[in-house]
Amino acid sequence: MKLRRIAEAKLPTPFGEFLMVGFEEIATGKDHVALVFGDISGTKPVLSRIHSECLTGDALFSLRCDCGFQLEAALSQISKEGRGVLLYHRQEGRNIGLLNKIRAYALQDQGLDTVEANLKLGFKADERDFTLCADMYNLLGIHEVRLLTNNPKKIEIMKEAGINVVERVPLIVGRNPSNAHYLDTKADKMGHMLFKKAQ
């Protein structure tokens, strides 16, 4: 177990009232949160989203990615379901950090795609550690999920970590002219299950 559960409080949102649960990485002190909606106890699989932190998309309304659109859509779907969990995985920029993400954006402005930009900066295409999310699920008492994702890597890692993903629920929102190439690159080079534009 890499995390410990630290604190919780009610979080009213436009989608209804969630319980915000805070976790801390034991080794680093870095924090992560889960937003819990409704009663997640029992044996029925829980609708869930693993959402990696994206300051630019989640808070600054960037159109370069689909993150903000996915965050809003996931919270809305969980609310409509009546129960569910969003894990807010604080690994900004696929875990290269905000400043390196800005550097990667600058390289993309020069014509590199999102994967090429990460590699040019000396990183892997995706540096995230999703095993932390399995720890969050376990600390919340969740063992079976219906996962809102387009990323097969998340499903694979959750299953390897003992979380049973019984269904993948697609979350395809927010495509626009500013992020179309980015989304196509995620589909082509990272295996994300997205509908591409007509060729």
UniProtKB/Swiss-Prot annotation:
Catalyzes the conversion of GTP to 2,5-diamino-6-ribosylamino-4(3H)-pyrimidinone 5'-phosphate (DARP), formate and pyrophosphate. Its cofactor is Zn(2+). It comes from the Bacteria. It catalyses: GTP + 4 H2O = 2,5-diamino-6-hydroxy-4-(5-phosphoribosylamino)-pyrimidine + formate + 2 phosphate + 3 H(+). Belongs to the GTP cyclohydrolase II family. InterPro entries: GTP_cyclohydro_II (IPR032677), RibA (IPR000926), RibA-like_sf (IPR036144). Keywords: GTP-binding, Hydrolase, Metal-binding, Nucleotide-binding, Riboflavin biosynthesis, Zinc. CDD domains: GTP_cyclohydro2. HAMAP family: RibA. GTP binds at residues 49-53, 70, 92-94, 114, 149, 154. Pfam families: GTP_cyclohydro2 (PF00925). Zn(2+) binds at residues 54, 65, 67. The gene is ribA. Its EC number is 3.5.4.25. GO terms for molecular function: GTP binding; GTP cyclohydrolase II activity; zinc ion binding. GO terms for cellular component: cytosol. SUPFAM superfamilies: RibA-like. The keyword Nucleotide-binding applies. This is GTP cyclohydrolase-2. Homodimer. Binds 1 zinc ion per subunit. One of its GO terms (biological process) is riboflavin biosynthetic process. The active site is at residues 126, 128. Pathway: Cofactor biosynthesis; riboflavin biosynthesis; 5-amino-6-(D-ribitylamino)uracil from GTP: step 1/4.
